[in-house]
């Protein structure tokens, strides 16, 4: 008798993706983040669903409804903090996942990589709109500042901003539509994640060496299912430590003040995972230039495959490129720190230098280092 797992139309898809999938025998823990992102997404959709049952997307009651969730709803506080801190875990996993792709040359799977970049943009859009929903001071002013950036687009800018706002300022219409988009986008992300996986399974996984692993494959289950479970346990441990011991560690105290259009907070800043991009935006004195730099800071990932000049795929055996990669990581941490600081000396100049370094490292130094390493191979 044939196994139902291998014959049933639905089970067959699951089997070929998660059970009998041939996987390289040497993929390290850096390959865990894909499954962790899946877990984060499921967690966010579930906690978000329960929050949406009690939330009201009206400017007069939004802030109160979030307070009501935390005070009166059974376990509402834990659902709310799991959702807020779950977003942080999501972005930690995202950054690790992208970093892994950059380090080991996974970007040579073009379709998988490009769908991944779209996923990153979609997740960032979702997180931004979610941050607006509690309707605190930072929610309101964050929404005002970031949507206002679109007014820098020549000719259509102002009309575009007012169209997004649904009026002449961030108000009821804006909050309602942001809630609608925040609800639908995670499902679009889930669909895109399936496309991401579909493209990945056309080629099979990369591995730390960057060398084809067709001669040495092992089944995904039980080897990598158990490895993913360990990763998931560590993820949940980290999340629950954050939720139960320091739920407001990564949040902004200003968001515990209801939104007030007449009172601007002294330092408007986004959640920590957007600070690097915010620092790049602020480091350019021109509005349109800043917006372009902001978009390019993420869109630059699309160019990475075309900038790959090395004869080797992975950075495992490329010490110069490794060095540049870790300088890039340090640069991004510097930008994250600067994004959270006020616009004054010496932060402005540090931010400008770090922004220049960011683009320089990716566009110039990495391809140059690869070419040098190619020449060193001849020695």
Swiss-Prot record:
Protein role: Component of the ubiquinol-cytochrome c reductase complex (complex III or cytochrome b-c1 complex) that is part of the mitochondrial respiratory chain. The b-c1 complex mediates electron transfer from ubiquinol to cytochrome c. Contributes to the generation of a proton gradient across the mitochondrial membrane that is then used for ATP synthesis.
Family statement: Belongs to the cytochrome b family.
PROSITE patterns: CYTB_CTER, CYTB_NTER
Oligomer and partners: The cytochrome bc1 complex contains 11 subunits: 3 respiratory subunits (MT-CYB, CYC1 and UQCRFS1), 2 core proteins (UQCRC1 and UQCRC2) and 6 low-molecular weight proteins (UQCRH/QCR6, UQCRB/QCR7, UQCRQ/QCR8, UQCR10/QCR9, UQCR11/QCR10 and a cleavage product of UQCRFS1). This cytochrome bc1 complex then forms a dimer.
Stored Pfam families: Cytochrom_B_C, Cytochrome_B
InterPro entries noted in UniProt: Cyt_b/b6_C, Cyt_b/b6_C_sf, Cyt_b/b6_N, Cytb/b6-like_sf, Cytochrome_b, Cytochrome_b_C_euk/bac, Cytochrome_b_N_euk/bac, Di-haem_cyt_TM
Major place of residence: mitochondrion
Cofactor or coenzyme needed: heme b
Residues given in the record as heme b b566 binding sites: 97, 196
Residues that hold a ubiquinone according to the record: 201
Protein's membrane topology: Multi-pass membrane protein
Binding site for heme b b562: 83, 182
Ranges in coiled-coil conformation: none
Additional observations: Heme 1 (or BL or b562) is low-potential and absorbs at about 562 nm, and heme 2 (or BH or b566) is high-potential and absorbs at about 566 nm.
Entry's transmembrane regions: 33-53, 77-98, 113-133, 178-198, 226-246, 288-308, 320-340, 347-367
Gene: MT-CYB
Keyword Isomerase: no
Protein name (Swiss-Prot/TrEMBL): Cytochrome b
GO biological process: mitochondrial electron transport, ubiquinol to cytochrome c
Keywords: Electron transport, Heme, Iron, Membrane, Metal-binding, Mitochondrion, Mitochondrion inner membrane, Respiratory chain, Transmembrane, Transmembrane helix, Transport, Ubiquinone
Any one cellular-component term (Gene Ontology): respiratory chain complex III
Entry keyword annotation includes Cell membrane: no
Cofactor binding note of this UniProt entry: Binds 2 heme b groups non-covalently.
Molecular-function annotations in GO: metal ion binding; ubiquinol-cytochrome-c reductase activity
Record localization: Mitochondrion inner membrane
Source organism: Oryx dammah (Scimitar-horned oryx)
């Amino acid at each position: 008798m044939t196994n139902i797992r291998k014959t049933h139309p639905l089970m067959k898809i699951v089997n070929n993706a998660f059970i009998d999938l041939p996987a390289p025998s040497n993929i390290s823990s850096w390959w865990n983040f894909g499954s962790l992102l899946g877990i984060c997404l499921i967690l966010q959709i579930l906690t978000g669903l329960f929050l949406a049952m009690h939330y009201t997307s009206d400017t007069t009651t939004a802030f109160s409804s979030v307070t009501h969730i935390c005070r009166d709803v059974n376990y509402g506080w834990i659902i709310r903090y799991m959702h807020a801190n779950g977003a942080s875990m999501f972005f930690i996993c995202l950054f690790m996942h992208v970093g892994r792709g950059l380090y080991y040359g996974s970007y040579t799977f073009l379709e998988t990589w490009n769908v991944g970049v779209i996923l990153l943009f979609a997740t960032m859009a979702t997180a931004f709109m979610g941050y607006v929903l509690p309707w605190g001071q930072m929610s309101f002013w964050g929404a005002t500042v970031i949507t206002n950036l679109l007014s820098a687009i020549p000719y259509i800018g102002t009309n575009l901003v007012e169209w997004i706002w649904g009026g002449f300022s961030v108000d009821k219409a804006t909050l309602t539509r942001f809630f609608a988009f925040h609800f639908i986008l995670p499902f679009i992300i889930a669909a895109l994640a399936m496309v991401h996986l579909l493209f990945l399974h056309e080629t099979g996984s990369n591995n730390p060496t960057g060398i084809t692993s067709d001669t040495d494959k092992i089944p995904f289950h039980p080897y990598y299912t158990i490895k993913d479970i360990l990763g998931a346990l560590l993820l949940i441990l980290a999340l629950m430590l954050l939720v139960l011991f320091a739920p407001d560690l990564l949040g902004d105290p200003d968001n515990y003040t209801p939104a007030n259009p007449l009172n601007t907070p002294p330092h408007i800043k986004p959640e920590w995972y957007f600070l690097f991009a915010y620092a790049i935006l602020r480091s350019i004195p021109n509005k349109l230039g800043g917006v372009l730099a902001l978009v390019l800071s993420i869109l630059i990932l699309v160019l990475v495959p075309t900038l790959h000049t090395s004869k080797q795929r992975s950075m495992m055996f490329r010490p110069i490129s490794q060095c540049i990669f870790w300088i890039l990581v340090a640069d991004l941490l510097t930008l994250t720190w600067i994004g959270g600081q006020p616009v004054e000396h010496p932060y402005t100049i540090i931010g400008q230098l770090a922004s220049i370094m960011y683009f320089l490292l990716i566009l110039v130094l990495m391809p140059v280092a690869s070419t040098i390493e190619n020449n060193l191979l001849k020695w």
